Every structure is written in C-alpha cells, then in structure tokens.
C-alpha cells in the first residue's frame, strides 16, 4: 500500500496484535487481540477480510523466516476459531492454506505450534465444505497427507518429535466431523494404517495400553454428563504428555485409533474397520494381536453402533474371491474373535449375518470341489466359518433367536424339491412347550432383497483392497440351497453346535424352544446316499433332543387325557420314524445304519417318553414283523438272516426302553432277560450298546452274529406284543394302545395327513378353568383339508373335550405348555472351535455290511 494511504481497519487491528522485536516465541498483544475479537464478533462479515489478510501475512513471514510472527498468526487464528466457530466456513480455506505453509516450512517448532490450531479447526469444523467446495477438499487432503508423512520420518534427528506432530494431527482429525462425511472418509485409511504401523513397530500390548489410558483418564464419580467427557479427554491428554517421547508415540497412536471408533458416524466406523482389515491382510501381523485389536475397537464404539464393525467384516469376507484363501482366513478369524467375545452388539441382524456366512461357506466348498482344491487352508477356512456361525449363538438379542437360526440352517438342508413348502419363523404354541411355526419365506425373501441392495451399494474398493472381487459369493441375506453332501455335513454340524453351545447356558429358559416343525422336510436325510450325511443328521437331532428335553428346569411332564401329545406323536417325529423304519429294513442296510437307527430310536423314546412311544411304535412294529419273518424263514424279502436278527434285537431293546419310560418294570425285566440271552447265544451285535455322539467311531461297528443259534431265539407275534402292552403298560390309556396296534396303513393315512398348517394356531393356553373347559385347547383359527383328514377334522377336538373336566394340574399345563423331564446330565462346558476340531464323521460307514 502506498505511503500515506491509511490501511483498512481490519488490517490495522491485525497488525496491532504483533509485538515488536524478533523473538522466536512471540505471543499476540493481549489487549489488541481482545479488541480484534470484539470487532469480528460484532461484524462477522469482516472475517472474510481478516482471514485472507492474515493468511497472506503469514505466508510472507514463513518465506522470510520470521518464526515469531508466524507463531503470532497461528495464535490469532486459534482465537478466531474459538470465538467465531459458528462462522468458521468463512475463513476455513485461509486456515488450511496457512497451516499448509507452516507444515511445509520444515520448521519443527512451527509445526508443533500448528497442532493446536489444527486441533481447534477439526473440533469446530462441521464438514459442510466437504459437500460442495472441491478446492477446499483438495487443500485439506493435501494438509492431511503432509501431517501423515511427518509421522513416517525415518530414524534420525528429532524423528520422535516429528512423529508426535503427525500423530497429534491424526488424533485431531479422528474426532472431526469432516472425516465422518462420505468425502472425508477416504482419508481414514492412510491415517489408520499410520497408527497401526506405529503400534506394531513398538510391539505394543494393546490391552495394557487400553487399561493405562483408562486409568490416566480416571475421574471422580461425582462428575457427569458432557463435562465429564470433556474432562476425561483433557485428563488423557495430560497423562500422555507427561510420558516420555517414546511412550507418547504409543499412547497417541492408540488414543487416535480409539477416537476413530468413539463416534456415532456409521461411515467413519465402517471406513476405519475396513482400513484395519486391509492393514492386517497386507502386513505380517500376528493373529493374536489382530484379533485382540478388533475386539478392543469394538468395545470403543457406542454399543448401538458396534454391529457396524461386524457387518463390515462380513461384507469384506463376502466380497472376496474364493481363490484368496489367505485373506479370507484372516477376516474369518477376526469375525470369529468378535463373535466369541463378550462384546454386546445391539441391533445386530443375526439372521442376515448367518445367511451371509452360510452362503460364503457353500461357495467355498463348491469352489474347492470344482477345482479339486482340498487343501488344509480350505478346510481351515470352512471350519472357521462354522465356528463363526456357532458363536452367533452366544449373542442372543430376542427370545426366538436360537429357534430362528436353527430353522434357517435346517431349511437350507431340506430337499430342494419340497423346500418351497417348508417354512419357519412365526411361532404358535402346539401344546408341548415347543412351538409350531408358520412359514415365513416371504419375510426372508424381502430381507434378502433389501440386503442385496445394501450389498450392491457397499464400497466397491473393498474387493480391490483385499485382493478379491465383489462377486465372490452370494450377498448378505440371499439364499443358497446347495444340498451337496459336504455342504449338508457342515450345516448339520453347525446346528449341532448351536445346541451344544446352548446346553452350557445357565438360564436356558430365557430362550424360546426350537419347534419340532423346524425339522420338517429334513427327515429324508436319514436315508441319504451319503453315510456321512446320515451320521451327521443323527448326531444333530440327538443334540436337539438333549437341548430341548434334557433340562428338568426347562420342561415338565404333561401328556393330557390321551396319554400323549398329538402334535408330537403325529407330527415330524412320526415322519422321521417312517424314515427310521426304511433305514433299518433296507436290504442294503449296514452295521452303521443299524447303529445310527438304534441310537436315534433310543433317544426319541428317552427324551419324548410317551409321545416318542406313540410316534415310533407303529413303525417299529412294522419293522419287527419283517425281522420276525426273516428269522423264522417266512419272508419273501431279499434281506439277509443276519439283518433280520439285528432288527429283532433293536425291537427287543426298544421294548425294554418302552418299559422304562412307561413305568412297566415287568416289561423292562422280560425284555432285558431276552437281551441277555441273545448276547449269550452270540445273536447280539455289540454296537447296539454303544452311546452315539459326534465323537463316536461309527466305522468300528461290526456284527459277530452266530446265525446257527437262531433257532433258540425267541420272537414275539403281533398279538403277543399287544398282550405285553395290555398286561404291563397300564399307564397308557386303552384307546391309545388300540391306536398303536391299528392296521399300519390306516395309521399311516392319518400320520401322512398330519402337517403343520399355513394358518395361525390359537395358542393352546388358558388363564382359568372356565376358559380351559370352554375349549381353548389347541383349536385352530381356520381349518383346511389335509390337517387331520376329511373324515376326522370336524370332530377331532370335540371328541377330546367330550366329558372333559379340567383340573388345576391341567390348567398349569395349559398355562406353561406341555413338556418333558429327563434325568440326563447337561453337557459340559462347550467351545465351538474345540467342538469343530474334534467333530469327525467317517467316509467308510456305508461299506460296513452284515
């Protein structure tokens, strides 16, 4: 400006803030600075002039090496930001340009002084300029890049101090609203990589660092609210700056990383999570360190946003190519660590996560089969995914969750030809305490569509960052109905894992029961072509029986006036019993088939008691007639004599079990004596005495049958069996015994029509004796053909209520639901990974012949 021409007032006010002299540690004149702040506070429009003037003066001072004046300019900017932060966008570009000039100067003292201005700028900037000012975005990202590069200075003079400057800036930007925008989030990855690199280089113990910061930021309990949060941050900052420079590097890195996750911005949490995963994949990070890191950062996030971390991990895993096994293993390990932890993830869509992992596992198995890649890495990845899904059972957020998870996996195991008619989800009490569920395929289809859109809109850079593709497998929530043996075996093991895991829970009554109807459509697996699938299916169903009927606190006996529950006896268990009959009477039945069939039969009777007897007896009686005909030489079937002997052995053991559950001690003794005799004669395969579980050696099953002694074997005719029941099983109502010995084809006609309807059922509960007597027991809201058969449906319930006078015990049963008691012990402590490591099935079971 020419001499003699007066300067504008805003320039004079700014210049008056500069003290005289050439000192390196100048500070603004306090009174003049106060007047400048008063001036701009009352005339905010002047900020548009003060900002550029201060920027230009600072640029000249930097170029001329006037360190003291630069510090004054930085202090003035700091005060302007504090006092006029509502209008920060008016001079935000000037602040960023000034900081760029300062950090590019290479002066350590000036760069350290710039940290305060940058921290205030990040604290008060609302991110608005990131939405419509590309020049500002470019400058700001350039500034961030310079700060990040400061922290990467190689070892040398003042390298630790330079690193602290960069880490201080990283901590500041981590808490900024600017980084939480879609545009600003692109800068998260390099900053997070810097922080993790710093932590890994120092070989930091993450849990110890977290604990130390918490102690350093501790406050008295009488301080609360936003004041407490602000004081907590100040206390942590003071704690960090009191440490040695080397410790400051570790604490600053850790605190900055914590700040990235201590936010309500979904975009920021998601971007930071992906950055962590990318770093772990591309760096040689120990697995324990990586898994600990993921669990710790999840605890930092607000509880209602923690699920974003898990969803981000699953999305990255789904997007990876099946060829990228190493990276998939890393992400799967992180998912498993998070699901195995005690981190509470409110709002987590468990079913979508389960569906995504099921699809991914099926895709990996299919890829391995098609490319003949049965490597240990693939097996490890498949096992890890199974462990992830089982661990989902430790995060229970609603009463029907276990039921829904089991139903979802079992639905994927049903025959694809009939899967459209099999559904699950909406619950209705069937009077057993187990719930009948109405099909909800449309609900899951809707969820699939919604999540397909979510998956499509996810960041496409994930695949590139992790060396994968976006179409690695089915998207989140979509269905995969692959019924190959390997897939079926894995899925059945997952369901078994759910039950084993839940058996260790102390308060299982907090979870609703898994309905028997969830198994509808899976009974064909008992006669699957693969012996391993059959084995896995039996293990799985036995685990279900132990879970639902193995805890005395969970269920109580209540069979009603007919001595059994029709929904159990004439429902899925009856259909399963048909398949059991087919399994043991098949001409190609092996020792493994007999072992599995006998184990399944024994568990059904032990757990379901009278209901199990009613459901299985017609089918076992039919099998007994075949076995007796084979033993006596009166059969035209092509089964062998040894098979007939084993069928008879199974039936005799079955009668012994019926005696046990029916309090018919004489029947138990008589059947037990026959068992002892057959063992003595060599007419008893030793494997019928084996307990069967997923750790059994099924392939060791062998039958040393001495067929020459068959003449000494005692067999019972149909009438003799009926006589035994009439004489000994007196606890069973006469009309029920009559049903058991009805013509087999007539019984099957009723059983085959007994299907779960699509309509809702009125819950079979009552709150008073009057209500119970009025007929609230298991009435249907609507009726349709095929429920019980045209000739039965109209009078079935009327017949049951005829002459029925409810008692207090009946009311208790109606209020609580009928159920069962077992004296079997609950499973010991269960670990999903250990279970999967020891869970083995054999591939030569089908080769064992009699």
Curated annotation (Swiss-Prot):
Gene symbol of the encoding locus: EFR3
Organism for this UniProt entry: Yarrowia lipolytica (strain CLIB 122 / E 150)
Protein name: Protein EFR3
Segment forming the signal sequence: none
InterPro entries: ARM-type_fold, EFR3, EFR3_HEAT-like_rpt
GO biological processes: protein localization to plasma membrane
Family the entry assigns: Belongs to the EFR3 family.
UniProt cross-references to PANTHER family, sorted A to Z: PROTEIN EFR3 (PTHR47766:SF1)
A GO term from the CC aspect: plasma membrane
Alphabetical list of SUPFAM superfamilies matching this protein: ARM repeat
